[in-house]
């Protein structure tokens, strides 16, 4: 009798154990497998961006909008950290930073962007664009996209960052200053006896660049978020520049511009127009429609577009 009771109890314990095992397997099949995937989807992607912009520059403000829009579109799964001028030490260049993985993206100043693509030297030439709208059409359109695709294969160009027109300061040694640089000099009363000209000759463009290998590791959705956010921030930046001319802000910051009727203004304007034509003449064999982005007036109705 005792042996039968023992056997019965043993069988009961076995059934309980078997039931627990089956329940564990069932739970693993229904709820266990997706857990790692869920955790991965919630993992944040951090994008560090190095620039040589001041915090109040036009280019930095566009990148701030880009960062905000990207975080919103990705529902906080992508976070952008911007670094302005002075936050990165030399001797390493921005190209070195992105190659070493110190940052994910860099906004290249002229010397470094020319190092990656010598043809980008064109963007330092005066009077390439006939209006602010022409600049926007160029960098937002197919011509700008083609120019970005000429970067070395190991790099990917997200887009061109607009930083406004440069201003010519003549204190005995003429030099071009960005909006942010001139604003600082005006606010700190550091212009002294310098003469400043608003020639609308050079518009500052810097490519936002990352490694192609890093870009390829992103999902299609992440790439789309980045591209859409950058494009929307670009549109907003140009709308703000059109709505309120940055030169007006400089005037309120203590900057005084020479009138365009003065001999000095006329002299510099003619000088830089000649510089542009000489550059085009020397590079006529290599410049295509998108390397020479002078935008002419729209053709009259019925006329066909001509290559610039």
Regions found by a protein language model. Give the residues of each.
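Hydrophobic alpha-helical context, especially transmembrane and signal-peptide helices
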Residues: 20-22, 122, 148
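Sec-dependent N-terminal signal peptides
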Residues: 9-22
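Short, solvent-exposed secondary-structure boundary motifs
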Residues: 7, 147-152
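C-terminal motif of bacterial Sec signal peptides marking the signal peptidase cleavage site
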Residues: 25-29
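Intrinsically disordered, low-complexity regions of eukaryotic proteins
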Residues: 4, 18, 305-308
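N-terminal secretory signal peptides that target proteins for export/translocation
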Residues: 1-11
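N-terminal secretory/targeting leader peptides
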Residues: 30-133, 151-154, 158-308
